[in-house]
């Protein structure tokens, strides 16, 4: 069933993992024209071909950029094809470790990919949305932004993105641009061992792991015209797990 997003243009950053692919499928099903960005060119091309075969309008942009200039170049490629960007979805996953075990390079990578890159994408895309009087920004994060043990570098980046999302939502609210965060819980993966899957599910109130489609459905709602009265918010898609934490705003 198609939503009221028909004709819009969406840039999905890091569309080359399971969640990114699910978001692309969800938005394509709503009639959104897509630009898929990510480092894995082969996986992007395969996804683009799959979507095009279903009638979607789609382009792939192979990039692992975290620097401002390279990100502006990637955004320019999308605008050259479509003329505008109405929806920006920033999806990013990162490994974490205990603070003393983190190398200098890993700290830099966590902050670059988890905070600097989305910041630069926002700077490159949001001004055009504000000028047009419409925009939807959805940043995908996870529960590690709350500051869980052994997640120091990722928690620093994720909590920074949380603050950035709220600040930008207030700055852009009068211009028809909404900015929100989807916070994932434990999402099932084909590589997750069965024993680990069962253990993780036991700690979730609904007693199952999330799926990429669960995350994509939340993104689809926040990317739609009908979510225009929702901005600066954090939508937890975690099977109730966030309710265990004292701070889950």
Curated annotation (Swiss-Prot):
Cross-referenced SUPFAM superfamilies: NAD(P)-binding Rossmann-fold domains (SSF51735)
Pfam families: adh_short_C2
Involved pathway(s): Xenobiotic degradation; toluene degradation
Source domain of life: Bacteria
Record-level GO BP terms: toluene catabolic process
InterPro entries on file: NAD(P)-bd_dom_sf, SDR, SDR_fam
Stimuli inducing this protein: Induced by toluene.
Similarity comment: Belongs to the short-chain dehydrogenases/reductases (SDR) family.
Function: Involved in an anaerobic toluene degradation pathway. Catalytically inactive subunit, which is probably required for the structural and/or regulatory integrity of the catalytic subunit BbsD. This subunit cannot bind NAD(+) or substrate.
Quaternary structure annotation from Swiss-Prot or TrEMBL: Heterotetramer composed of 2 inactive BbsC subunits and 2 active BbsD subunits.
Name of protein: (2S)-[(R)-hydroxy(phenyl)methyl]succinyl-CoA dehydrogenase subunit BbsC
Gene: bbsC
